[in-house]
Amino acid sequence: MRIVLITGISGSGKSVALNALEDAGYYCVDNLPPHVLPELARYLAQDGQRRLAVAIDARSSASLDEMPGLIRELSREHDVRVLFLNASTQALIQRFSETRRRHPLSGSLSHDADVGLLSSLEEAIERERELVAPLAEFGHQIDTSTLRANALRTWVKRFIEQKNNDLMVMFESFGFKRGVPLDADLMFDVRALPNPYYDHQLRPLTGLDQPVIAFLDALPIVHQMIDDIHAFLMKWLPHFRDDNRSYLTVAIGCTGGQHRSVFIAETLAARLAREANVIVRHRDAPVDVDASSRLVSEVDRP
């Protein structure tokens, strides 16, 4: 059975992810107490169910300590994948404010003063981060701070499309001026490379557009940077596998996240498609949803 566990911070999009999995044919359960999970998996497997998705959050805090052991136990018999959703505190506060929902750990929030409300909400968010932190190492982390709901649904679809449970590598382009990704395991700064932004004809384009590709592809220093990063990854990916890592996020950053980082993330993703399951995501580039997050196959390899 394929089991997808969705966990992370409240307000980061767990309900959106669960709905996307339900649309994909998964039997979905929200806020399941962790200790019930093995029994539920056995029952559904006997009943012929082949896909199960479960959302687990800090409301199950009394049982969260059991999760690492449960994940290992379930992985002996099932294809278990863990998706850990995260977001910046600022983004979470804005979402709770817009939806007028109360954080599940907030207790009684005072509405007498905005400062008191935000302080209580911030404390609840930080407390939840502490509670679910041990689960982050088991899952593929995704920073949803800048993701719209439809983009997250597309990303979840790509996540479940990988064909096996081998190491998944996500190349994530981003712009430093919008902050570094919360989900990065490795980060490479490519701001030292020539910037297409200063060519007025290239400025409105992205690293997915042919004129920008031609501009960067013609520069030896760009290929040197790509070759060096690729060599580093090829050397160390086997060690990540030996450490039983299932997921690795490689962030590639330039100034705005539109030209250089996009081109380099795409190029590296295509090169590594034969070595691992690869997803490429463009956090800050103004591209459509399908282009912003996609699974890379060997046919994409140049």
Curated annotation (Swiss-Prot):
The positions making up the signal sequence are: none
User: What are the alphabetically sorted keywords of the record?
Assistant: ATP-binding, GTP-binding, Nucleotide-binding
The record lists ATP as bound by G8, I9, S10, G11, S12, G13, K14, S15
What GO molecular function annotations does the UniProt record carry, in alphabetical order? ATP binding; GTP binding
Residues reported to bind GTP: D57, A58, R59, S60
Question: Which domain of life does the protein's organism represent?
Answer: Bacteria
Query: What are the disulphide bonds in this sequence?
Result: none
Provide the function of this protein: Displays ATPase and GTPase activities.
| Family the UniProt entry places it in | Belongs to the RapZ-like family.
This chain belongs to which protein, by name? Answer: Nucleotide-binding protein BceJ2315_08000
